């Protein structure tokens, strides 16, 4: 389906895109006139453009024009050398001739070689009425459609702008959070050094405790030895006491005699 655009958009597209070919399309009206429109084909475009031209009388056969079947009761179309030329839109550039080469010569397709330079336009299957054309044009994009698209683009642009501001604010927040993380990292590093120093102190204290335990163990062994000696001395004292008691008894016996 060709895409319908405005004359202004067509002129802009003609300046920015390379035009490849065009053909004239006619639609039969009830008053015997044809509605002529030029269908342009552009390079690197996935659609064609129909540019409306003013109403023209019935057109006979020509290189780029095909004559359709006559409607019953309609006037006969002239068929002869005196063919009226197609009316041209003043804003529409003439694309029937290609760009001139160096030296002022035209591309092939001039009067010396009429069989070259133009692509043959296929004959339309049938002519359509105004109503049928309007039904088909409903599928084409209109100025209102372009306006809606422009509005959507404006909304998307504003949305992207707002999102860009939000991303900028979030970037500042992330940057501030990064600084906080760096400060926390330094604090954790200092605390780690302190914990490491405390660990060294605890390790030294543990070594001291081990040495004290060893000394306590040695003192315990000495205490045990002293207890054994005290026990032995106690037994010796008991023997001495018993000996003294026996000696006292003997003395008493001797005195009584």
From Swiss-Prot:
**Compositional bias annotation for Basic and acidic residues:** 80-104, 115-132
Q: Which Pfam families match?
A: DUF16
Q: Which residue spans traverse the membrane?
A: none
Q: Which domain of life is it from?
A: Bacteria
Start and end residues of each stretch annotated as Disordered: 49-132
Query: What family name appears in the similarity comment?
Result: Belongs to the UPF0134 family.
Q: What is this protein called?
A: UPF0134 protein MPN_013
């Amino acid at each position: 389906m060709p895409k319908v655009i405005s004359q202004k958009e067509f002129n802009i597209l003609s300046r920015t895109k390379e035009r490849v070919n065009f053909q004239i399309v006619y639609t039969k009206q009830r008053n015997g006139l044809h509605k002529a429109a030029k269908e342009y084909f552009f390079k690197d475009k996935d659609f064609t453009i129909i540019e409306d031209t003013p109403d023209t009388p019935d057109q006979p056969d020509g290189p780029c024009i095909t004559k359709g079947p006559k409607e019953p009761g309609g006037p006969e179309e002239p068929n002869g050398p005196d063919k009226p030329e197609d009316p041209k839109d003043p804003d529409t550039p003439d694309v029937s001739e290609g760009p001139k080469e160096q030296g002022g010569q035209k591309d092939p397709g001039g009067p010396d070689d009429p069989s070259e330079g133009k692509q043959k336009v296929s004959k339309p299957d049938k002519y359509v009425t105004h109503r049928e054309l309007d039904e088909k044009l409903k599928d084409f994009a209109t100025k209102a459609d372009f306006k809606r698209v422009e509005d959507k683009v404006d909304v998307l642009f504003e949305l992207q702008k707002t999102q860009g501001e939000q991303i900028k604010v979030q970037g500042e927040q992330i940057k501030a959070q990064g600084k906080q993380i760096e400060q926390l990292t330094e604090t954790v590093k200092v605390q780690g050094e302190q914990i490491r120093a405390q660990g060294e102190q605890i390790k030294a204290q543990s070594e001291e405790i081990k040495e004290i335990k060893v000394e306590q163990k040695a003192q315990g062994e000495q205490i045990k030895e002293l207890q054994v000696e005290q026990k032995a001395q106690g037994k010796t004292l008991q023997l001495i006491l018993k000996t003294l008691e026996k000696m006292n008894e003997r003395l008493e016996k001797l005195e009584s005699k």
